[in-house]
Amino acid sequence: MSKKCEICGKSRTFGNNRSFSLRSSNRSWAPNIRKVRALVDGKPKRINVCTRCLRSGLVERPQFIKTTEEE
């Protein structure tokens, strides 16, 4: 699964771990990515989205219509 948001483009950032003696080792921070069904060009599609885009309402979710069959 890719660690990149398809809405805002947020991806991994890189930095260092710093020990008590101030030696550094490389590390990375990954965004909180969720795979959700969203409407893309009016059609439902499964995309990778960060939780900030989900919470801010930038993702339009498809509506599921419950059908009842009459007997």
From Swiss-Prot:
A GO CC term assigned to this protein in UniProt: ribonucleoprotein complex
Keyword tRNA processing: no
Top-level division of the source organism's lineage: Bacteria
One Gene Ontology biological process: translation
InterPro entries referenced in this protein's UniProt entry, alphabetically: Bacterial_rp_bL28, Ribosomal_bL28, Ribosomal_bL28/bL31-like_sf, Ribosomal_bL28_bact-type, Ribosomal_bL28_sf
GO molecular function, one term: structural constituent of ribosome
Keywords, alphabetical: Ribonucleoprotein, Ribosomal protein
PANTHER family: 50S RIBOSOMAL PROTEIN L28, LARGE RIBOSOMAL SUBUNIT PROTEIN BL28A
Family under the similarity heading: Belongs to the bacterial ribosomal protein bL28 family.
Protein name: Large ribosomal subunit protein bL28
